[in-house]
């Protein structure tokens, strides 16, 4: 069975591009949502292997780090990962309890694909 990914806050350009990558490379099913409330509702339904959160949510400009905090505080046992090229944002996400993520500049790198795959299989 493939990986199930919850993708939070990507824009209309990056979201479909990332979804296609995960589907092609990881045989993943990707659900895209646009807010922390949506993410929490989807997580409660279960079945996800990993949550990817954009640093800035495209729909309203809110902080992906705040989304990560909410998800972690909710008690989820699903690994949460920040999508950001900014090292300081990655550091803050890890401090909040997330797994160190990746930036879009390295999106198609084999190491990024492997990171998502290995994290989702934890």
Q: What positions do the PLM features span?
A:
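Acidic, metal-coordinating helix/loop segments flanking the phosphotransfer/catalytic sites
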Residues: 34-50, 56
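Conserved acidic segment of CheY-like receiver
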Residues: 2-13, 18-22, 32, 51
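Receiver (REC) domain switch/output surface
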Residues: 95, 111-122
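Conserved phosphotransfer microenvironments
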Residues: 51-71
């Amino acid at each position: 069975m493939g990986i199930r990914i919850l993708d939070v806050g990507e824009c209309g350009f990056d979201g479909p591009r990332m979804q296609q990558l995960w589907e092609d490379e990881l045989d993943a099913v990707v659900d895209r949502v646009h807010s922390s409330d949506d993410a929490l509702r989807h997580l409660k339904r279960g079945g996800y292997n990993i949550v990817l959160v954009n640093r800035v949510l495209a729909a309203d400009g809110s902080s992906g780090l705040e989304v990560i905090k909410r998800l972690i505080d909710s008690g989820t046992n699903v690994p949460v990962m920040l999508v950001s090229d900014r090292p300081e944002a990655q550091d803050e996400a890890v401090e909040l309890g997330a797994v160190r993520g990746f930036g879009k500049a390295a999106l198609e790198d084999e190491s990024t694909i492997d990171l998502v795959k290995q994290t989702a299989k934890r």
